[in-house]
């Protein structure tokens, strides 16, 4: 709770069973069997929340630092407790759900407490693929009724093929012209089934086409593309180059990086240092992001290096501790390689990736500065080492 995450629990695994869910595999990290949150538990949680000073930051329902995205609005008391939170505190709250909030209730709360609810609605898709991906999710009608009101701050949905993301964007914008449209592709990881993986990859092939259609539609909503690490890296290439230049690395220095940053550096700073490309082996699939690298991933790529520079973002997998997303500690990792000295690039951190790198994540930037820039073809042509 020190990170303002409200620890509710369904007391069981999420029953929604979305085929794309990143919670299908827990082997890479420690999990906790937390019982169903009771009224007594909630009273304790609420008192703890009330004891914290109110700041600009929001409290969160619907996820934790271990990437658990169980839909907590399936808890039978979730809406009652949300109301009590809003009534008895002056704090703001962020909600994550695929649409299990009663439409009238959540929109009435947004009217009653303007500016205090940041509702991030996971639409995923409104089209023909919805039943395959989300067999137990709320109906399209339920999702649209939630959207038809002031509650939803942002709606995320994805390209799954021709006339998917673009059609959804127009549908949502017709009934809600204010919510942010958060788009892109779903990323297949190694434990996602083959049929869903193929659908995700089909979506990526059509992302450019779908994005251009939305760009040409000139919707009143803010539109963003935020799931594609390669695109994000390319759009922020100047910031990435500037950050690495400021680290004052020598040409002989070995620097760990995921594929997206590796491609930027090889395109624009080929001989700045020795770039050690590290695949996201732990998560596998098409994952290609420094934030999701683990120490195990790095260890697999080390040979006889004596000094290696690590981006700090790898060490920020757990709040306030030097651990990766799997829970492995930096100290433990270092002990496995006694002949190698590890240095941390403190400027390459989660603050950079979560804030600065998202500044150019608008769909307009993708269409104009990525698709419209001939340099992106050279970027895409760069091959990653085996």
Q: What does each model-found stretch correspond to?
A:
Residues 2-10:
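Immediate flanking context of iron-sulfur cluster ligation sites
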Residues 5, 25-45, 49-103, 114-143, ...:
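Core AdoMet radical
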Residues 9-26, 284-289, 311-317:
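Local cysteine-cluster metal-coordination motifs and their immediate loop/turn environment
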Residues 37-47, 74-83, 136-146, 164-172, ...:
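Well-ordered, non-membrane alpha-helical segments in soluble/globular domains
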Residues 57-59, 117-118, 138-224:
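Conserved C-terminal portion of the radical SAM core fold
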Residues 86-93, 115, 147-154, 173-181, ...:
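Structural alpha-beta junctions
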Residues 102-106, 263-266:
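Short, well-ordered alpha-helical microsegments
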Residues 222-386:
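Radical SAM enzyme core and accessory elements
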